[in-house]
Amino acid sequence: MKRITLFLFAIVLTCGAWACTSFIISGKATPSGKPAMFKHRDTGELNNRIAYFEGKKYAFIGLMNSPMLDGEVWSGMNEAGFCIMNTASYNLREDTLDCQMDREGELMYHALSNCATIADFEAWLTTYPQPWGVEANFGIIDAQGGAAYYEMNNSRYIKYDVNTMPEGYRVVT
């Protein structure tokens, strides 16, 4: 039995997993009283880097694929304390629009450049051109203590406020 278990475990370790996992912990569940976020990024791009950008309103740092020069990041934080990350989802699309998809990195790049708080993000989304070209869960925390996930597709979102969760956290994969 031990050999079978070891063999199965070895197979699982060698299989590729392409699902990001993230979690947000609200300030009510952290010793500092400030929210925290974590993302495990599964990607086919093995070369990544952290880059600094002078944004439209805010300067920011972001995680990006090394071959990219500008225009998209896969998580980041700006000088106002606004942080964003995403996990891809493949079951949120409700339309059959013929549009470019996989634009999550572009959306996060522009959000970091323009938003300081969760409220700013929601207001900014009303001006961001649709279709958004996304199918993902975006995790956001801010310096004001905001902590939320946004389940988004091309034209709408559902907000999950982590500060109202009884356990004080939310895990998304």
Question: Which residues fall in each region the model found?
Answer:
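C-terminal, well-structured catalytic/ligand-binding subdomain of enzymes
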Residues: 21-22, 27-71, 75-76, 80-109, ...
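Positively charged n-region of N-terminal signal peptides that target proteins for export
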Residues: 1-4
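Bacterial N-terminal signal peptides
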Residues: 7-16
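Secretory/export targeting leaders with adjacent low-complexity proregions
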Residues: 123-139
